[in-house]
């Protein structure tokens, strides 16, 4: 057999340690696919109410186009 690490009385081959390490890193690095995403909001600050309405309507209209 080849060289092996002895951990808690058991012989563990190096390739199993490598696979376990890569698997653990993969689980820690990959983001959670089941996590709910918060919808993005835009904070509109204008002095003019007409500008504010125009921007809100523009964003609403173009966000509907992206959804379709």
Curated annotation (Swiss-Prot):
Membrane topology: Single-pass membrane protein
UniProt main location, coarse: mitochondrion
InterPro entries: ATP19
Subcellular location: Mitochondrion inner membrane
A biological-process GO annotation: proton transmembrane transport
Keyword Zinc: no
Gene Ontology terms: cellular component: mitochondrial inner membrane; mitochondrion; proton-transporting ATP synthase complex
Keywords, in A-Z order: ATP synthesis, CF(0), Hydrogen ion transport, Ion transport, Membrane, Mitochondrion, Mitochondrion inner membrane, Transmembrane, Transmembrane helix, Transport
Residue intervals passing through the bilayer: 15-31
The family this protein is said to belong to: Belongs to the ATP19 family.
Note: Present with 1320 molecules/cell in log phase SD medium.
PANTHER family: ATP SYNTHASE SUBUNIT K, MITOCHONDRIAL
Function in brief: Mitochondrial membrane ATP synthase (F(1)F(0) ATP synthase or Complex V) produces ATP from ADP in the presence of a proton gradient across the membrane which is generated by electron transport complexes of the respiratory chain. F-type ATPases consist of two structural domains, F(1) - containing the extramembraneous catalytic core and F(0) - containing the membrane proton channel, linked together by a central stalk and a peripheral stalk. During catalysis, ATP synthesis in the catalytic domain of F(1) is coupled via a rotary mechanism of the central stalk subunits to proton translocation.
Quaternary assembly: F-type ATPases have 2 components, CF(1) - the catalytic core - and CF(0) - the membrane proton channel. In yeast, the dimeric form of ATP synthase consists of 17 polypeptides: alpha, beta, gamma, delta, epsilon, 4 (B), 5 (OSCP), 6 (A), 8, 9 (C), d, E (Tim11), f, g, h, i/j and k.
The protein, known as: ATP synthase subunit K, mitochondrial
Organism: Saccharomyces cerevisiae (strain ATCC 204508 / S288c)
């Amino acid at each position: 057999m080849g060289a092996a690490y002895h951990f808690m009385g058991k012989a563990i081959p190096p390739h199993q340690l490598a696979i376990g390490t890569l698997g653990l890193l993969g689980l820690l690095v990959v983001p959670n696919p089941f996590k709910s995403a918060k919808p993005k909001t835009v904070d509109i600050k204008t002095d003019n109410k007409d500008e504010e309405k125009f921007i809100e309507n523009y964003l609403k209209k173009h966000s509907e186009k992206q959804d379709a």
